[in-house]
Amino acid sequence: MEGASFGAGRAGAAFDPVSFARRPQTLLRVVSWVFSIAVFGPIVNEGYVNSDSGPELRCVFNGNAGACRFGVVLGLGAFIACVAFLLLDVRFQQISSVRDRRRAVLLDLGFSGVWSFLWFVGFCFLTNQWQRTTPGPGTAQAGDAARAAIAFSFFSILSWVALTVKALQRFRLGTDMSLFATDQLGTGAAQAYPGYPVGSGVEGTETYQSPPFTETLDTSSKGYQVPAY
């Protein structure tokens, strides 16, 4: 079945990059992609500082290596997902199967919802570990990176919640079956039927057309007639 469904036009239609770039969902994915870089980038570059007791590096978030790893994995996952879903949005117009479109929208909805929750957990976790961090020369140097990761974790919550809402709206759009009516049902019930072909031996050149349903049924009761023997 080829037609408009789940917020996209008919399959095989020409791709318009200008209108695609102006879509709210596209802008949200780009913003979320930038936010993900702003989270894992500072942690990778400046998130590990020298400890006061030795040359080994420790995580700036209270020395908890799990906090740094969680922030990096969360940011990298969001980075890859934004790129993948952007490519899926580009190809979405070419998907002719309504079932495949539904699966793509459900995947977007499920992933966006899960990542919104993980961003909330990550924001709370990083904030808690930063509040417990003991001030020192290393933490003062990497303080800006830690605060940037926390701030953009919060912004990522908002952007991914917005993506979840947009995916839910697209899922609720579903499929408008009226768009396929002209393809499946033809031009209507009053379509004229062609007459007999020439040389078939049947006279008459007029075409037959089904009459409109305006006739009334004869509701008068007929009397009982005695059969003749």
Swiss-Prot record:
Q: Which Gene Ontology BP annotations are present? A: positive regulation of transporter activity; regulated exocytosis; regulation of synaptic vesicle priming
Keywords attached to this entry: Acetylation, Cytoplasmic vesicle, Membrane, Synapse, Transmembrane, Transmembrane helix
Q: Where found?
A: Cytoplasmic vesicle, Secretory vesicle, Synaptic vesicle membrane; Synapse
Q: Where is the composition biased (Polar residues)?
A: 209-223
Tell me which domain of life the UniProt entry assigns to the organism this sequence originates from.
Eukaryota
What is the annotated tissue distribution of the protein whose record heads this document? Specifically expressed in brain. Found in the brain across the dorsal and ventral corpus striatum as well as in the cortex.
Disulfide feature: none
In the record, the note on similarity to other proteins reads: Belongs to the synaptogyrin family.
Quote the protein name from its UniProt record. Synaptogyrin-3
The record lists the lineage as:
Eukaryota, Metazoa, Chordata, Craniata, Vertebrata
Gene behind the chain: Syngr3
